[in-house]
Regions:
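Solvent-exposed, polar/charged alpha-helical surfaces in well-ordered, non-transmembrane soluble domains
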Residues: 70-73, 124-131, 188, 192, ...
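Surface-exposed patches in mature extracellular/periplasmic domains of secreted proteins
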Residues: 84-89, 138-146, 259-267, 338-339
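Short glycine/proline-enriched loop/turn "hinge" motifs that connect secondary-structure elements
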Residues: 101-103, 165-168, 290-296
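Short glycine- and acidic-rich boundary segments immediately preceding or forming the N-terminal edge
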Residues: 41-93
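Secretory targeting and sorting signals
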Residues: 1-41
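A short loop-to-beta-strand scaffold at the N-terminal edge of the catalytic core in hydrolase folds
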Residues: 93-100
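C-terminal accessory segments enriched in acidic
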Residues: 18-21, 41-63, 196-199, 215-356
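Active-site/substrate-binding loop(s) of hydrolase catalytic cores
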Residues: 106-115, 120-245
Length: 356
């Protein structure tokens, strides 16, 4: 949601608690689609919507840090031992950097959300996915048997509480540009968790900060697939193939859903992003030894359109549907043979500031 003007909410550390009112967490999972503030749709071109500087935006239906603590506690307690919740460390403001582990399969899958604190709906989507992975659904059982899934619902809790993109203290920086210098405690903690868990596959959930249209159309682009956070020349052949396979599994799942108007994310080469260094290796926090490039074989990201309020549920499904598809393909073995011939034909989108 970069570039959008949104209100700042009050920050404040909350201690990690081990028991909560379960009903509140149920509301968190089931009710984030509710609208608490009614406002007219802002102007947009075409199709919007876009947040305007003077627009009243309610964050009451968006998962905050306390909601994440509560939801993870509920899921862990009701999972009958299938889910364990741990802390990778503490944020700059002292919040626990919480993650959940579900499954005990031989392949580790890393899933993180909200590395940018003001990209709101990925947290709720990840909590829904975790809740489902702890269920008796046959697909969930298969994933648990074949994968060990590391789930990080809120990578940047301080930024999320402040409703800003960056971290807050001791440095206000983009945490998705900190896997070379590691100046923030969040980056150090999650790098160590990545090294410890050695995920073969990784997925990072984001929101767009603009309202693009699919090239050659007037269709609002609602989902962008990011198969390359770095140039393919920086990846191994296996990594580049796996990234495209993960991308096409995601795209095909959303095509069946409809209305996503999918496009490529712009071609970038950002070496200090978290996923980039998962693929490349070669960097480490002070006092640590860098790992080799071969640790992670595939790492991609999603960009979903921003602004919920009247469409929270749809935005969350744009995350949950492709994520579950990739998890399933990784678990049932189809990912490794998935056809990537349609990847190059995916359109790009024309970026445009909201409301202009």
């Amino acid at each position: 949601m970069a570039g959008a003007t949104v209100p700042t909410v009050t920050t404040g550390g909350r201690p990690l608690r081990k028991s909560f009112v379960a009903a509140a967490a149920v509301v968190l999972i089931a009710g984030l689609g509710a609208v608490s503030t009614a406002t007219a749709d802002p102007p947009h071109n075409p199709g919007g919507p876009c947040i305007q500087p003077d627009q009243n935006v309610s964050l009451s239906s968006v998962a905050g840090y306390a909601d994440v603590v509560q939801a993870l506690d509920r899921i862990e307690r009701t999972s009958k031992g299938l889910v364990s919740v741990s802390s990778a460390g503490t944020s700059g403001e002292g919040r626990e950097l919480l993650y959940a582990t579900v499954g005990d399969g031989p392949t580790t899958f890393w899933l993180h959300a909200r590395i940018h604190g003001n990209e709101l709906h990925s947290t709720e989507a990840v909590l829904q996915i975790l809740d489902h992975l702890a269920s008796g659904d046959p697909r969930a059982r298969l994933i648990r048997e074949q994968l060990t899934v590391i789930v990080i619902p809120m990578y940047n809790p301080d930024g999320a509480e402040a409703n800003i993109r960056q971290s807050t203290t001791p440095n206000r920086i983009d945490l998705n540009r900190d896997w070379e210098n590691f100046v923030q405690p969040e980056s150090v903690a999650f790098w160590k968790l990545w090294r410890e868990t050695a995920p073969e596959l990784a997925l990072d959930l984001h929101h767009m900060g603009e309202a693009p249209v699919v090239n050659g159309t007037n269709d609002l682009n609602q989902f962008q697939i990011g198969a390359r956070s770095i140039a393919p020349s920086r990846m191994t052949a296996e990594q580049w193939l796996t990234n495209r396979q993960m991308a096409m599994v995601s795209v095909d799942a959303l095509d069946r859903y409809g209305l996503a108007n999918i496009a490529h994310y712009p071609l970038i080469d950002i070496t200090n992003a978290a996923l980039s260094r998962m693929l490349m290796g070669g960097t480490a926090p002070a006092g640590e030894t860098p790992v080799t490039q071969s640790l992670t074989k595939g790492a991609i990201f999603y960009e979903v359109r921003s602004v919920g309020q009247k469409s929270n549920g749809q935005l969350e499904r744009l995350f949950t549907i492709p994520t579950m598809a990739v998890l399933t393909a990784a678990a049932d073995g189809t990912l490794g043979s998935y056809d990537v011939s349609g990847y190059d034909a995916l359109p790009f989108a024309t970026q445009g500031p909201c409301g202009e």
